[in-house]
């Protein structure tokens, strides 16, 4: 049986109000709230402020990761939400971000990650690998 | 004129020797070296060890990000290298990782991010956005 390990939403958001995405202070609550809305488990998160404007944020999750990179000069956010486990979690986090940022258009793709894995190749004895 | 802000390599690596990817100690030098090989600028990196095995690593780069998630029980690494600037940097980092991990097969995609941006929509006065 084939199994995929996770689902990855890859979205470029256009026409976002630059004031919402110019600073790390602006994007950090959006990202942190998206993690909560998605019922995701944060291991750590890191934000960075570019000069004169623009920000990046990346969160390491127990379920994989979530990242934000912003170009306020273009009204652009490039967003990745990659989660394992309950597939609706990524959707919930994504829907929250769209609700807050209100892009005028979105280039959206959703990918299966690890989709060539077959359950029967699973190595069941972890000691084999140490 | 249309411009893309970056290039994103999305790759699932299969058939990787589980010993190379079972621990955060094993993957961290690979990731850090890939950043150097790609001439990328690290802002921060974070690693996490799953029990009984498997690891995640994520690096925030001035050029965007690089992430690793491993499932040694499947011989699987899901890898993302997303960079702005010189497009050959992502390729160099990717080539290094492939050379070290020697997967038996790779599901590889390369995407333009922010590809709907038009240069003429650029807002040139940053004060407009503050």
Swiss-Prot record, chains A, B:
<dbReference type="InterPro" id="IPR003826">
    <property type="entry name" value="AdoMetDC_fam_prok"/>
</dbReference>
<keyword id="KW-0745">Spermidine biosynthesis</keyword>
<feature type="modified residue" description="Pyruvic acid (Ser); by autocatalysis">
    <location>
        <position position="64"/>
    </location>
</feature>
<keyword id="KW-0704">Schiff base</keyword>
<feature type="active site" description="Schiff-base intermediate with substrate; via pyruvic acid">
    <location>
        <position position="64"/>
    </location>
</feature>
<keyword id="KW-0670">Pyruvate</keyword>
<dbReference type="GO" id="GO:0005829">
    <property type="term" value="C:cytosol"/>
</dbReference>
<keyword id="KW-0456">Lyase</keyword>
<feature type="active site" description="Proton acceptor; for processing activity">
    <location>
        <position position="69"/>
    </location>
</feature>
<keyword id="KW-0865">Zymogen</keyword>
<comment type="subunit">
    <text>Heterotetramer of two alpha and two beta chains arranged as a dimer of alpha/beta heterodimers.</text>
</comment>
<dbReference type="Pfam" id="PF02675">
    <property type="entry name" value="AdoMet_dc"/>
</dbReference>
<dbReference type="GO" id="GO:0008295">
    <property type="term" value="P:spermidine biosynthetic process"/>
</dbReference>
<feature type="active site" description="Proton donor; for catalytic activity">
    <location>
        <position position="84"/>
    </location>
</feature>
<protein>
    <recommendedName>
        <fullName>S-adenosylmethionine decarboxylase proenzyme</fullName>
        <ecNumber>4.1.1.50</ecNumber>
    </recommendedName>
</protein>
<keyword id="KW-0949">S-adenosyl-L-methionine</keyword>
<dbReference type="InterPro" id="IPR017716">
    <property type="entry name" value="S-AdoMet_deCOase_pro-enz"/>
</dbReference>
<dbReference type="InterPro" id="IPR016067">
    <property type="entry name" value="S-AdoMet_deCO2ase_core"/>
</dbReference>
<dbReference type="GO" id="GO:0004014">
    <property type="term" value="F:adenosylmethionine decarboxylase activity"/>
</dbReference>
<keyword id="KW-0620">Polyamine biosynthesis</keyword>
<keyword id="KW-0210">Decarboxylase</keyword>
<feature type="site" description="Cleavage (non-hydrolytic); by autolysis">
    <location>
        <begin position="63"/>
        <end position="64"/>
    </location>
</feature>
<keyword id="KW-0068">Autocatalytic cleavage</keyword>
<comment type="function">
    <text>Catalyzes the decarboxylation of S-adenosylmethionine to S-adenosylmethioninamine (dcAdoMet), the propylamine donor required for the synthesis of the polyamines spermine and spermidine from the diamine putrescine.</text>
</comment>
<comment type="pathway">
    <text>Amine and polyamine biosynthesis; S-adenosylmethioninamine biosynthesis; S-adenosylmethioninamine from S-adenosyl-L-methionine: step 1/1.</text>
</comment>
<comment type="similarity">
    <text>Belongs to the prokaryotic AdoMetDC family. Type 1 subfamily.</text>
</comment>
């Amino acid at each position: 049986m084939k199994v995929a390990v996770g689902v990855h939403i890859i979205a470029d958001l256009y026409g976002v109000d630059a004031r919402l995405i110019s600073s790390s202070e602006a994007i950090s609550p959006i990202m942190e709230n998206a993690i909560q809305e998605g019922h995701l488990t944060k291991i750590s998160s890191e934000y960075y402020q570019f000069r004169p404007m623009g920000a990046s944020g990346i969160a390491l999750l127990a379920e994989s990761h979530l990242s934000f990179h912003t170009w306020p000069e273009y009204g652009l956010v490039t967003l990745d939400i990659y989660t394992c486990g309950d597939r609706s979690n990524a959707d919930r986090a994504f829907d929250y971000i769209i609700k807050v940022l209100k892009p005028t258009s979105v280039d959206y793709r959703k990918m299966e990650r690890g989709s060539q894995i077959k359950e029967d190749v699973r190595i069941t004895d972890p000691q084999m690998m140490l």
